[in-house]
């Protein structure tokens, strides 16, 4: 983990410098040159313990009743006693071509060009819910306290600012999550993508999601 942390620390150094600033200022001052963050969820390693969900809620102060991250369990696969479950991560895909960004009338939903992270500026959000309707992955919600759109931001305002990995990655006991710079061929995530077969959910939509998945069974691709 130390090696992978070092791979992306250069990309989050600026984030630490702007800790505590308002969302609008953060969006304008980020300068993470050459970084395009992505994540891999290895379904063959995920055990559905939901430690990632708990860590996300705690670190990002997500109220009960809503969630930035959900682990969905499939129907039983196989026959007793060899029954297995597939666990599917439902969260923001941080699309390069994000429909939520395209429909936002105020510019509150944006894709940070320097890091690739899709985020929401709460100072600009008017709660119109256009982005929620446009997202084909159904991962956005209205925050019950701020009344603005919310979702996974790869812990951009919390762990990344502190030079840490996203909370879900740090909490996973089976190392089913890998996070890093997709544009760095030597990063842990780039090496993993070369080594294992992966798929991306609803890729045919042309959104270019940056959440990759190692399938539950090799050769099995879910759409």
UniProtKB/Swiss-Prot annotation:
Keywords: 4Fe-4S, Electron transport, Iron, Iron-sulfur, Metal-binding, Oxidoreductase, Repeat, Signal, Transport. Residues 37-65, 83-114, 116-145 form the 4Fe-4S ferredoxin-type domain. CDD domains: PsrB. The keyword Disulfide bond does not apply. [4Fe-4S] cluster 2 binds at residues 56, 152, 155, 168. Exported by the Tat system. The position of the signal peptide cleavage has not been experimentally proven. InterPro entries: 4Fe4S_Fe-S-bd, 4Fe4S_Fe_S_CS, Cyt_c_NO2Rdtase_NrfC, ET_IronSulfur_Cluster-Binding, TAT_signal, TAT_signal_bac_arc. Gene3D superfamilies: 3.30.70.20. [4Fe-4S] cluster 3 binds at residues 92, 95, 100, 135. [4Fe-4S] cluster 1 binds at residues 46, 49, 52, 172. [4Fe-4S] cluster 4 binds at residues 104, 125, 128, 131. GO terms for molecular function: 4 iron, 4 sulfur cluster binding; metal ion binding; nitrite reductase (cytochrome, ammonia-forming) activity. Residues 1-27 form the signal peptide. Probably involved in the transfer of electrons from the quinone pool to the type-c cytochromes. This is Protein NrfC. It comes from Escherichia coli (strain K12). The gene is nrfC.
């Amino acid at each position: 983990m130390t090696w992978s942390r070092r791979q992306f620390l250069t990309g989050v150094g600026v984030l630490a410098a702007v800790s505590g600033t308002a969302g609008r200022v953060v969006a304008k001052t980020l300068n993470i040159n050459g970084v395009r963050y992505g994540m891999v969820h290895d379904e063959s390693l995920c055990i559905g313990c939901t430690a990632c969900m708990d860590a996300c809620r705690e670190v990002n102060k997500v109220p009960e009743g809503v969630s930035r991250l959900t682990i969905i369990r499939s129907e039983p696969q196989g026959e007793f006693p060899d029954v297995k479950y597939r666990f599917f991560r439902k969260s923001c895909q941080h699309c390069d071509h994000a429909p939520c960004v395209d429909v936002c009338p105020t510019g509150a939903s944006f894709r940070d060009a320097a890091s690739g992270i899709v985020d929401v500026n709460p100072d600009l959000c008017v709660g119109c819910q256009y982005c929620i309707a446009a997202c084909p992955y159904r991962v956005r919600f209205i925050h019950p306290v701020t009344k603005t759109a919310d979702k996974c931001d790869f812990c951009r305002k919390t762990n990344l600012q502190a030079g840490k990995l996203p909370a879900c990655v740090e909490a996973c006991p089976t190392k089913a999550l890998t996070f890093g710079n997709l544009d760095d061929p030597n990063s842990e995530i780039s090496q993993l993508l070369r080594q294992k077969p992966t798929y991306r959910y609803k890729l045919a939509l042309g959104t270019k999601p940056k959440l990759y998945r190692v399938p539950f069974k090799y050769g099995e691709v879910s759409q």
